[in-house]
Amino acid sequence: MKCVEVYKKLYHQEPFDVAFCPYRISPLGAHIDHQYGKINGLAINKGIHMAYHLKQNGVVELPSLNFPKRAQFFVSAVPEEKQGDWADHLRGTAKMLGEKYRLKVGLSGIIEGSLPIGGLSSSASVIICFLSALCKVNGIHLEPMEMILTAKAAENQYVGVSCGKFDQSCEVLSKKDHLLYLDTKDDSYELIPTSEDMKPYKVASFFSGLERSLKNSKYNLRQDECKAAAYALMG
């Protein structure tokens, strides 16, 4: 992991911990989660890593190996308005978590994505990776569904992306060699193991050469169009 190497060179010490959140793929279910449908997916062995240490003064200082500009803010005084950069995902996470729990400890380190941005729920991965680290340094334990909903709220209410809960659910609930089957209406789910009779397989993900950000795309418009189509079908 390059983030660990950079961390050691920058801070001349071993990190307190290295947080990780995987990316996910969705065989079936695009634009179904925000319409409360049933979807499936699985996490992969690539994702977001973050090498970090505690900051008792409550400051978050995180440069990214993938984006310019360092994220820097107090966990107890997150700006009300988003700043329009990648660090909005971190600010939104701290703000949503801080509405339920008292945050006193910040963190400093290096964050890194192992694949190009876009298409594999990298935004949700960044949020959950940071959320798990922020919880750890503040002694907070979140149950899986609370972690999923906190991460979703960061994107919905702060970043401004009207996503559903599939990305977060897949990244939190997935298990190796299992397929996640999730009903986004009642949050019930099943982890379906690979059948012993199934032939060996590999999942391939191809990069188109284009990077994207949902907050700068027509994602929210797609959600509105899905709702309009549902209303039309219902008569």
PLM features: residue spans?
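Glycine-rich, charge-dense phosphate/pyrophosphate-binding loop(s)
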Residues: 18-24, 28-30, 176, 184-187
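Short beta-strand scaffold segments in enzyme catalytic cores
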Residues: 26-29, 48-52, 169-172, 179-180
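ATP-dependent small-molecule kinase catalytic core of the GHMP/sugar-kinase superfamily
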Residues: 35, 140-235
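Short secondary-structure capping/turn segments at boundaries of alpha-helices and beta-strands
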Residues: 14-15, 28, 36-39, 49
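FAD-binding core of FAD-dependent oxidoreductases
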Residues: 26, 33-36, 43-44, 86, ...
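Beta-strand residues in well-ordered beta-sheet regions across diverse protein folds
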Residues: 28, 51, 61-63, 182, ...
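Anion-binding (especially nucleotide phosphate/pyrophosphate-binding) glycine-rich loop
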Residues: 1-18, 46-148
